[in-house]
Amino acid sequence: MKTKLVIVAALAAMTAQAEFKIDRSVMSEEYWKIWNDGAQAKIDADIEKYRKADGAFEIDAPDGTEVKAEQLTHAFFFGAHIFNFDQLGTKERNARYKALYGKEGALFNSATVAFYWRTFERFPGKPRFEAGAEDSEAFWNTCPNPKEQPHWRRPPSDPVVDYLVSRGCRIHGHPLVWGNNTWMTPNWLWDELCPEAEKAALEKASGVKVPRWNASIPAGAPSRKLSKEWQRAWKKIYAKLSEKQIAALVPTFIKAQNECYERRIRQIGARYGAKIHSWDVVNESATDFDLFKRKAVRNRPFDASHYGLMPADYAYKAFLWAGKYLPQTAWFNLNDYNMGDGFFLQAKDLTAHGARIDVVGSQMHLFNPKESANIAIGKGPEHLRPEKIAERFVRVSKANRPIHLSEITITAPDNSPKGQMIQAIIMRNCYRAWFSVEKMTGITWWNVVDACGAPGEPSISGLFTRDMQPKTAYFAMDDLVNREWKTKATVKAQGGKVSFRGFRGSYRLTWKGADGKVQTKFVNVK
């Protein structure tokens, strides 16, 4: 109860502060020529067309009775990752952070939960579902070097999922399968699953030394360095040995690797069932599909992935395993940054062979502060101009699936008041353009807090400063989600019904009955 009161107080404090007024002067005339009145009118018209619906509801009230319709929740999901759960250094910061996530009244009604295999199962057979002492708020509040900890930005899943369930927040799991060796594949996989005799035979035949892992290797940069060496080693092996030769040399590893991937999905499915509403079943695999000449060969022994050796046709298998172990109610996402032809051909190939793809995930990261500064003067990346955003999602819509804009970064050029306003305006215009896309179903901001991203990501791309003070972009986003895009209307009853048009979501209808008492009805605009 005490924790709940702290979170409610934190949310109330941020709501009381929330006010956003655009300062157009921080952007050049050239910028406003790009985001001109005509472009804005087109966005407004598409938002009205695609994000709203007409609702008609029966009520027990005489004709002419005034009825207030107040939107409570969105059908569209506005999300962010929740990787810094309890890690921000003080109870007050953590409470503010947690208060951002919830079904009603919060900024984010959806949260992306980390299931990166490398940190989720740092040691074989020991998945980090439950919290240990090193995951506690007390640990992080006294930790002098949080970014150097192996579990920084990787909280155990149970406490995060339990919290989000208590808040009625939608939960998105990221990811189940991803070939990336730096962030996903456990260091121990090769050494644990491949017998020494097979390792020696492979190294002798190829002349390539495959890096070894042991538990004494520090997490963080040393571990990531080892992963890159492992990836380079496999590229050399591919160049020297045929697929058949490799398969003959390491058959035990190939079999065990498949079993290990399947076991991971089975364990997660058994643990969470329907608690998690959607999954990035496979992440960033289109490059491999292109590498294999855009044709999935289902009888190959393994995939000679650009990431390193992967299970044969791993993207296809990931969807089959997900279908086997996860509930039918969960949405299955194919997520990628690569929106080339290969992505759409891969989606077509997967579904043609029986994979269930419910949603396609697309990413957009504006990491470079200089690019944000250039955008403000009317230059910068063309893909963030309104007409190019529209063109991109006409292309993504070719997959004929709902779209989840799954990872969004828009950095500030700097954290001065002007820099924060530039970030807020870029974010506001892009969010409006994305929200107007017909097939868009949700948008997920990536790093909520400054200086809390992965190595190489900008330190000023958050909606909050490192000490959880709201930046201008927070107020701009809250203004969109909780004001501009929430419907409040007063209508009159007619023939035992009320009708109105509003953003899709849940509503509370209130009116005074004949006895003067307030009557309430909860409805959904679909």
Language model segments and positions:
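Beta-strand-rich domain onsets/edges
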Residues: 19-88, 110, 123-130, 151, ...
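Aromatic-lined substrate-binding rim segments of carbohydrate-active enzymes
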Residues: 104-108, 113-242, 248, 260, ...
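Aromatic-lined carbohydrate-recognition surfaces of secreted/lumenal glycan-active proteins
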Residues: 79, 277-284, 309-343, 404-409, ...
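Conserved, mostly hydrophobic/aromatic
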Residues: 57, 111, 164, 268, ...
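Short Pro-Gly-centered beta-turn/loop motif in secreted/extracellular proteins
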Residues: 90-106, 499-508
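Substrate-binding cleft/loops of secretory-pathway carbohydrate-active enzymes
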Residues: 333-363, 422, 453
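Aromatic-rich peripheral "rim/lid" segments of glycoside hydrolase catalytic domains that contact
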Residues: 24-26, 31-33, 190-223, 233, ...
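Distinct, well-ordered alpha-helical segments
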Residues: 88-95, 290-294, 318, 339-354
